Amino acid sequence: MSKRSADDATGSSCLVAAAAAGQPPIKKVHFEPHLIGPVSTLEEMDIKVLEFQNKKLAQRIEQRMRTEAELRHRIEQLEKRQTQDDAVLNVVNRYWNQLNEDIRVLLQRFDAETADELENRNENEVTTSFLAQLSTWDKEELDEKLANRVQVSKRAVAKIVQVIDRLMQRNEKITHVLKGDSLASAGSGSGAGAGGEEEQQQASGDAETTTSSAGVHALEETLKQTHIEIMSENHKLQNLNTSLHEKFHTMSLKMKEYQDAHTAKETENAELKNQIDELQYDLEKIHCRNDKLENHLAEAIEKLKAYHQIYGDPNKSTNSAKTPTTTGSGGATTSVNSQLLEELQKELEEYRELANNRLQELDKLHATHRETLKEVEKLKMDIRQLPESVIVETTEYKCLQSQFSVLYNESMQIKTMLDETRNQLQTSKNQHLRQIEVMESEELIAQKKVRSEMIQMEDVLALIRKEYETLRIEFEQNMAANEQTAPINREMRHLITSLQNHNGQLKGEVQRYKRKYKDTSTDNLKLRQELADALATLEGNKLQAATGAAGEEIKQENSTGVKEENSNNVSASGQTNQTNSGNDTNVAIKEENHISAEDEADDEASGKDVKDGIKQEKLSSGDAAAAEKKDSPGPGNSTSSATNSVPVKNEKDSKDGVKGKDVKAVESETVRDLKAQLKKALNDQKEMKLLLDMYKGVSKDQRDKVQLMATEKKLRSEIEELRQQLKKLQESKREERKKLADEEALRKIKQLEEQKYELQKQMANHKPTDNSWGSGAPGTANYTRPFVGSHEEEALLNEMEVTGQAFEDMQEQNSRLIQQLREKDDANFKLMSERIKANQLHKLLREEKTVLEDQMATATTQIEAMHIVLRKLEEKERSLQATVASIEKELMLRQQAMEMHKRKAIESAQSAADLKLHLEKYHAQMKEAQQVVAEKTSSLEAEAYKTKRLQEELAQFKRKAERMKKMEMSGTTIDEVMIEEIREYKETLTCPSCKVKRKDAVLSKCFHVFCYDCLRTRYETRQRKCPKCNCAFGANDYHRLYLQ
């Protein structure tokens, strides 16, 4: 980018661009204010402002003078270049015209029929001044005209080539003909010889044949020699052609290299031009700065001079400084007056020199003017006393003579025409009278016809009026009916618009439900994870609470009720497990049946029902698993109580391990369930997409019906789900009550087992070493525990083992049944999804089948249409062939006509060439006369310009002289005169009506200038006339004026 564009751009754009490019912002130009100094009155302030303005104007004038000098120098350079270009163009035009003339002469020499009207026209145009044509043409016209001229020259060259080709063909034909004649002559000679042998009687005929054969032989030899020479020349030309082709190839390669170099140089040239532009712009800036600095320097020097004149030089001796202030001030005033006088004297001397120079120029101009007047008078005398021979020899006299003869002949022809027209007028008058009589008779007949037609039209009008009345009545009836039906139509329109809005809202709700579905799926995953963590923590809390309660109740209960409570607890736990498993299976079966019924009832709302079924099943399976986990420690405790071999710590460790395993199994099961749900959700999403596509393909009425049905089904399904949830809540309450009873029984069993274990420990501690309880007191009986080592204890233990095994078998059976139920549910879900997919695929296939059938029908119709088009095209082809044959015949006729026109064009071209020569002579004479007139007019204009300039200077000198006379007469100084002039100027600038304010408004009617307030007050007070010329004006006739 050059610096001009950056400087010309606005401040805001520059700052933005600089901030975007990371460059510092461009500094703003600040103009220093001019200090006027202390001012006492408005007149002094105006004088100082005017002085400053005059200085600025002087600076601008100097700059303008410099720019004018530079531009003049540039104009001179451009004029020189233009003259050179004009000379080159003239040379090119001259040689181009000469080439066209030579080509035309060659064409006329070879074949007179090859000339063209366009070429003659172009030649006629070319003979006129080429530069004048170039100046009149635009860019587009110039390109077109020059291209046409180039095409003309190309055509001429092509015609020369055609002529040469024709000559070559003609020569070849001649050679072929001559060869054929020679062969025929040879054959005739051999036949004549045979006839001479057979008929030896005709000796004279033999002599003739021998002489003719000798002549033919000589011709053949000459033709052979010429043919050999032509062939050798042809070989030479071919060799030359090949060598020229080689040279052309090499030259073209060099040309390409030079072109590449040229393009590189052009790019360098463009870069250098840009640099030159930038440097020129910098140079202009520097010149402006230099001018400003020079002006500032000049002002500073003037101020220094004035300061030195007022206060004296500081370098002078101190004696001069010791002089009194009064003498210094008086000297300063005298020095100022002396300087002003010296400046005025210098100006007077300069004006005197200018006046002397102008006087000398005026004397010279007067002398030349007198000489020119003498020459003009001589020429006038010569023109008045011209001899007859000169007049007769002039071309103008000859032209007038020829025009007179032509006009005389025309006048004679016009006389004859007049006589003929008079005769025709008389005949036409007679015919006109006859026609008038005929017209009158026809008018009477037409009037009768019009009257009869008017009567008929009146009858028709009466019929039309009757029809109009009937139609009007029908129209009023229709209008009444329309007024009745109009509100119904409006209601229907409102209904349609409301339904359309409802459809749009439903579409938005569908998108919102999709988003909600995604959010609920993510929330579902999070809730499941939280549920698994909560279950794990609950199980741990329950186990801790159970162990703490068992430890407190051991001391309160006796060991006698252990067996009975254990047996009761075992039976109760078995029954609860069975009931729980039965309830779980029943719930799962019910849910499965419910899901299958809903899927069979409604295919469209299958996705939501399946998801709800999956959630319910997961909850039920989770409850069953939790119940199994809670019930599973029962048999382990019974076996431990029976064996009495494993301690409490080992049992706690084993319980913690089982808990960890159960938690991991729950987590793995939840992960698997979530993955399965994810797959099912994706399948449901695909199915919903298919349903959406199907929904889009259906019409609006069907969509509305489907939406209503779907909303009804959704509401019904929601009601059924709420009912199921109520049932499940009731069942869950029952199960929780049962679970609480089972947990209390298990706690009691654990408490009793722990009491039994502690009692056994106490028994072991209290047992003596010699196993004799009454050794200390003989005669006393030993106290023994009942059922120790008895059959009843063994039977109880066996029963306990059997019940534990039965409980384990029941648990295994329950788990197997749950797994089978899950597998069945998965299979049912898969079958249902496959069924939905199959139904959708069936629908899609049906639609594809219908689409393909439609395509087949359209294809068959297109094929039939193409067959019809083919037949039509064949018919058109036949008709076109017939038209082509007729056009060929017309072409033959037109070619013959063209040849005739070409011959006529050649004749007209010859006549045009003769006329061209005469025109050239006349143009040369005209140019000479124009040059003479232009020289004289330029000299006269220069004299007039000089006289005007002298008059202006004289007027200026007169003004200055009058000013000086006034000063001498009044005895005032220059300052007073200047003040008077300033006062006069101020008076001219003040408003003439109020004589207070400045002129700042102009009337567009009379162009008198006043202040804006005066004109506005005049307009408001209805005095709407100009104060000077009483010209009326309006609101739009006075405008603001800004004088500087």
Curated annotation (Swiss-Prot):
Family, per entry: Belongs to the BRE1 family.
Name of the protein in question: E3 ubiquitin-protein ligase Bre1
Pfam family, one: zf-C3HC4
Gene responsible for this protein: Bre1
PROSITE patterns listed in its UniProt record: ZF_RING_1 (PS00518), ZF_RING_2 (PS50089)
Keyword Transmembrane helix: no
Lineage: Eukaryota, Metazoa, Ecdysozoa, Arthropoda, Hexapoda
Domain of life: Eukaryota
GO cellular component: chromatin; HULC complex; nucleus
